[in-house]
């Protein structure tokens, strides 16, 4: 379990940093949660210490690549928001290329970043089984919800018009939907929210490399 938390912390940290100048709502969501749950700050600090300790103890450990099963919840109002399987697969491909440092422009890494550029030995795949039953790892839910506001949790619950998360201890949940305003997406840090809202939310025009993705964001 500790290893899973560590991997997800890396993933969400990278997502938050890469979107910092592109209207990522991660920090705003975190601040909003901490205002009503101030005890989460101490828990997050404690987790950070444990992660740093784990890193020091395992810095020379040899490990094989870890594969994280992903479930993509497509919550849509109309056909244009109901992105294709192919579009979803392109985003998974981009994640794997980036985390395994197999992206085509890896050789163009700026000199200052070369010491830190590495194969993270983390891979992602769409979930193949859920509750013992074969699955595509893709859930489609048509909704009457308007655009999803940054501080709304409706996207995370089927009874509220969204799509409920699969076991967040076993799957990385990603919700793709129409997000209100200029927010492109957000992610939840460990101890940064309800376990049922744990995952990543991305606007359908900023997901993948084909289909509905906006021209400026076709690199996944």
Where are these regions (language model features)?
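Bacterial Sec-dependent N-terminal signal peptides
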Residues: 1-25, 95
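Metzincin-family zinc-dependent endopeptidase catalytic domain
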Residues: 89, 93-220
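N-terminal zymogen propeptides
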Residues: 19-65, 99
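Sequence-pattern detector for short linear motifs
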Residues: 5-6, 32, 143
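Fold-level signature of zinc-dependent metallopeptidase catalytic domains
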Residues: 52-96, 175-181
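Short glycine-rich, polar/acidic loop-and-turn segments at beta strand-coil junctions
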Residues: 10, 74-76, 128-130
